[in-house]
């Protein structure tokens, strides 16, 4: 591969990969250029595209999946299983790149992601689909952390500044394409919804070939010389297992409580107790592990880091709930097909992407990011609150406007926590701070579908019991798009109203969580982005000391 020597050492993905002293003593680092750099960029663009499509393509297919599997109660798990696995294993996967050959770890992560897609595509029942999504989430954790790591190891800072927006821009494109592709595939009687998982394979194959032949001589692992016992200790596998178990228990409680079982039932209560005990054990383990822990607790001594993590989790809950349940409104209440529901979701996705770019540009120009964290949640909450005005016959102009408000609100503020941690933390701590922001963002995304599902199913059952002549359990079992086949025509409007009313309960989450995020934003330190010249040569902490 074509490479060039520079004197700037690459940054790691965790605080124990590099430190301030090491960065000044490292020899010249050889970076990619030319065709090798272009090939790697295309590979990462392909990966970002498939990950983005995979995140959004499922939303428009869920109503059909619930109808095929008679599994309306599993809506939350189709998204949560993927995000829980990705969230819980992200720090551990990130550390694998410090210990082992980055080429092999990345390619193995891609293979695991594709394996999960195959399992989901051939799933004979709902549980198999959930397992496949969880396996894909494990692979995605390795791909997300690996893309950042390989860029820092193999691409100069100057080229990173140019390539990162291009690579990440594919994520926005994929997010917009996902609902359209998912809807079109789901409506096709030949392909069916299963093909939305098969399409991951060609993208992954292209990326695998490019990465494999581009990284013929990958840089050595920065901690490859450690003993296997030391590597195992620093991976903190017990911590990852405890976190995975705690989050699963919480999701089971949210899925069952008040729907499958009463909240007072021993199964639900046991899951909540299990969540509490596992969480306490996990926190104790992180405290004892210090720098070897998955989540170094000392990083949260900074109030900006703590506020940013909480803020990111809360706004993520709001946007994921809306992304998952707007398609259910379109398909169950308005009786649109999956393709059209994907088109109808574009105002939310496009406004989100455009406002993210605009907010980032404005923050970079004026140097302040905190005001966007004040304004964004208020706009996001307004968009969620206005859903209370939505009815089965609401004109399209209104629900398009409501989605645009939500997208603009989220886009205004979603990137600001990432900037904040880079401003307030010392350079060696910045990678860990960024991982924590990603971690809490994924945590919010993992919890959101289950919270929304619980509110939706509980409200739907409650509303259906008021409609005489309707078997509420049968309607729920029929799924979000299949209930019309079993409901008498004279009762259809009442059942549709029951769906719409239940969805209004869900969208209150889109009001409450941004409001809490707005409160959290007031804990942010009022800091300014360093100017571009100082940003190259100094860390934010060093700049602050000079002033």
UniProtKB/Swiss-Prot annotation:
It is a multi-pass membrane protein. Residues 1-23 are annotated as: Disordered. One of its GO terms (cellular component) is plasma membrane. InterPro entries: MFS (IPR011701), MFS_dom (IPR020846), MFS_trans_sf (IPR036259). Gene3D superfamilies: MFS general substrate transporter like domains, Multidrug resistance protein D. The chain crosses the membrane at residues 33-53, 74-94, 104-124, 135-155, 165-185, 195-215, 240-260, 267-287, 310-330, 343-363, 370-390, 399-419, 432-452, 506-526. Glycans are attached at residue 463. Keywords: Cell membrane, Glycoprotein, Membrane, Transmembrane, Transmembrane helix, Transport. It is found in: Cell membrane. Pfam families: MFS_1. Belongs to the major facilitator superfamily. TCR/Tet family. This is MFS-type transporter ltbE.
């Amino acid at each position: 591969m074509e490479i060039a020597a520079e004197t700037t050492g690459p940054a790691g993905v965790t605080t124990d990969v590099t430190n301030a002293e090491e960065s000044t003593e490292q020899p010249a680092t050889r970076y990619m250029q030319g065709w090798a750099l272009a090939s790697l960029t295309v590979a990462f663009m392909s990966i970002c595209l498939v990950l983005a499509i995979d995140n959004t393509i499922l939303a428009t297919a869920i109503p059909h999946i619930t109808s095929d599997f008679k599994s309306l109660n599993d809506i939350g798990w189709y998204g949560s299983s993927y995000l829980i696995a990705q969230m819980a294993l992200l720090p551990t996967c990130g550390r694998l790149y410090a210990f082992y050959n980055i080429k092999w770890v990345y390619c193995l992560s891609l293979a695991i992601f594709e394996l999960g897609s195959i399992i989901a595509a051939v799933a004979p029942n709902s549980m198999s689909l959930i397992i496949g999504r969880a396996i894909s989430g494990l692979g995605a954790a390795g791909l997300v952390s690996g893309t950042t790591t390989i860029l820092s190891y193999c691409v100069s800072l100057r080229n990173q500044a140019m390539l990162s927006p291009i690579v990440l821009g594919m994520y926005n494109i994929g997010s917009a394409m996902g609902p359209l592709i998912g809807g079109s595939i789901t409506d096709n009687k030949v392909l069916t919804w299963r093909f939305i998982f098969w399409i991951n394979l060609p993208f992954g194959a292209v990326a695998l070939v490019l990465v494999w032949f581009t990284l013929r001589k990958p840089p050595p692992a920065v901690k490859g010389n450690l003993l296997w016992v030391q590597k195992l200790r620093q991976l903190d596998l017990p911590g990852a297992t405890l976190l995975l178990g705690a989050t699963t228990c919480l999701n089971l409680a949210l899925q069952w409580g008040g729907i499958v079982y009463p909240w007072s039932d021993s199964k639900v209560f046991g899951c909540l107790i299990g969540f509490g005990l596992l969480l306490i054990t996990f926190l104790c383990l992180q405290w004892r592990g210090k720098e070897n822990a998955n989540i170094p607790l000392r990083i949260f001594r900074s109030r900006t880091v703590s506020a940013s993590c909480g803020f990111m989790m809360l706004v993520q809950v709001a946007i994921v709930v809306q992304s998952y349940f707007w398609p259910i409104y379109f398909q169950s209440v308005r009786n649109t097909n999956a393709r059209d529901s994907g088109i109808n979701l574009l105002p939310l996705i496009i406004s989100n992407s455009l406002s993210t770019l605009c907010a980032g540009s404005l923050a970079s120009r004026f140097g302040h990011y905190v005001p966007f964290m004040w304004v964004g949640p208020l706009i996001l909450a307004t968009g969620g609150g206005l859903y209370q005005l939505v009815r089965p016959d609401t004109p399209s102009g209104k629900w398009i406007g409501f989605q645009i408000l939500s997208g603009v609100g989220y886009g205004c503020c979603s990137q600001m926590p990432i900037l904040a941690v880079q401003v307030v933390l010392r350079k060696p701590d910045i990678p860990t701070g960024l991982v924590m922001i990603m971690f809490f963002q994924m945590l919010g995304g993992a919890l959101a579908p289950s919270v929304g599902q619980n509110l939706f199913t509980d409200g739907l059952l409650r509303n259906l019991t008021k409609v005489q002549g309707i078997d509420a359990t049968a309607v729920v079992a029929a799924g979000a798009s299949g209930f019309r086949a079993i409901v008498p025509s004279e009762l259809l409007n009442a059942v549709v109203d029951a769906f719409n009313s239940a969805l209004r309960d869900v969208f209150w989450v889109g009001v409450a969580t941004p409001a809490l995020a707005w409160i959290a934003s007031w804990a942010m330190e009022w800091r300014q982005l360093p100017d571009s010249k100082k940003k190259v040569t100094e860390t934010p902490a060093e700049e602050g000391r000079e002033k």
